[in-house]
Amino acid sequence: MTNKEVLDNASLQRALTRITYEIIERNKGGQDLVLVGIKTRGEFLAHRIANRLEQLEGVKIPVMAIDITNFRDDVLNHDDSLGLNDEEKTNIADKNIVLIDDVLFTGRTIRAALDALIHIGRPNTIALAVLVDRGHRELPIRADFVGKNIPTAQNEKIKVLVQEIDGRDAVEIVH
């Protein structure tokens, strides 16, 4: 297998900054906004976007991370647990949610995340932000905020590297 870097650290940072500005424009600041990162890498991206929002708008935005494993359509034993402790639970009722993930591919992870969010409350709106949209949708799901569109072949994979886990920031196509 070979890896081809398609976003370096600087490009990844610019993509997150662009997403942040688009979130500000859409939400007219940060009031009633909650960022929800899909574990694992979406969680780190959500925190980074929240930090940028705080720097730009002077408002601290709540960030929540959800584990959607039990809401996936390929998991047989559902226990409807999000793996959240009480400190991690944020009231999402009547809030404007931005759901954040690293890669949008078939749409199945996002569908599971939507099910998980509805399970814990009824938000006012839900928007989707992804660092990379690679196409090949199996469900009618579209991101509202996209860092970079990277068309791929069906047999290729997108690998998002984040400093917090991988020691560097980059996006690679794996052949």
Swiss-Prot record:
Keywords: Glycosyltransferase, RNA-binding, Transcription, Transcription regulation, Transcription termination, Transferase. InterPro entries: PRibTrfase_dom, PRTase-like, PyrR, PyrR_bifunctional. GO terms for molecular function: RNA binding; uracil phosphoribosyltransferase activity. Its EC number is 2.4.2.9. It catalyses: UMP + diphosphate = 5-phospho-alpha-D-ribose 1-diphosphate + uracil. Gene3D superfamilies: 3.40.50.2020. A motif (PRPP-binding) lies at residues 97-109. Transmembrane segments: none annotated. Homodimer and homohexamer; in equilibrium. This is Bifunctional protein PyrR. The gene is pyrR.
